[in-house]
Amino acid sequence: MKTSKTASESGINLEIIFAGRSNVGKSSLLKELFGAKVRVGKRPGVTLRPTHAQVSDLLITDMPGFGFMSGVKERKQDIVKDKTVHYIEDNAGRIKIAVLVIDGPAFPEIVDRWDSRDQIPIDVEMFDFLREIGIDTIVAANKMDKVKENESDPLLNEVAIRLGLEPPWQNWKHIIAPISAKKGDLKTLKGLLRDRLHEMKRDDLFKYI
């Protein structure tokens, strides 16, 4: 599968983007989700621009990690965030699905820390932005293997609350997908992606997901 920084855009009818902080396991998720079927390139160092893979008329885009990035100045972090927003705005017509990857166990604490400074956490800001411009958004709550089974539902309720969604989280199973990329547990996310492709009458793309 051919990948490039600026994938050939001929014949693209729909796009799925993957976004998230730089330390939430997004690259592991992409590798586990698509494997050898679709190579979404991970260039050495910090990814500062989108990376693409095209299959059929579907473009899969790995957005640069936003927020704190080791060894990257704050000004450049802001530029990455702005470029990400501009990319999404410019391509909103063809971006049919966005997968926002979060660190599930750490998410409530991260949001509360930002709230205590009277700042909107970038994950929440991105979630609201994607929904405001009409992009169907899935929140992949990664690293759930670190959470005990009896603590999973209470944690996911807290995740829902921080996203502005009324708990219980089970009311939002079409949006929140608890996963563990490291353990290869992506069943819920795959199911939600396929549900959406089915609604678009694009079952032909199931073989890539």
UniProtKB/Swiss-Prot annotation:
Q: What does this protein do?
A: Necessary for normal cell division and for the maintenance of normal septation.
User: Any idea which positions bind GTP?
Assistant: 20-27, 45-49, 62-65, 142-145, 179-181
Task: Show where the EngB-type G domain sits.
Answer: 12-203
Question: What GO terms in the biological process aspect are recorded for it?
Answer: cell division
CC cofactor: Mg(2+)
Protein name, entry field: Probable GTP-binding protein EngB
Top-rank lineage group of the source organism: Archaea
Q: Which InterPro entries match?
A: G_ENGB_dom, GTP-bd, GTP-bd_ribosome_bio_YsxC, P-loop_NTPase
Example GO molecular function? GTP binding
Keywords attached to this Swiss-Prot or TrEMBL record, sorted alphabetically, are:
Cell cycle, Cell division, GTP-binding, Magnesium, Metal-binding, Nucleotide-binding, Septation
Record's SUPFAM superfamilies?
Answer: P-loop containing nucleoside triphosphate hydrolases (SSF52540)
Stored PANTHER family: ENGB-TYPE G DOMAIN-CONTAINING PROTEIN, MSS1/TRME-RELATED GTP-BINDING PROTEIN
Give the matching PROSITE patterns.
G_ENGB
* Name of the gene: engB
Which residues hold Mg(2+)?
S27, T47
Matches recorded under Gene3D superfamilies:
P-loop containing nucleotide triphosphate hydrolases
Family per similarity comment: Belongs to the TRAFAC class TrmE-Era-EngA-EngB-Septin-like GTPase superfamily. EngB GTPase family.
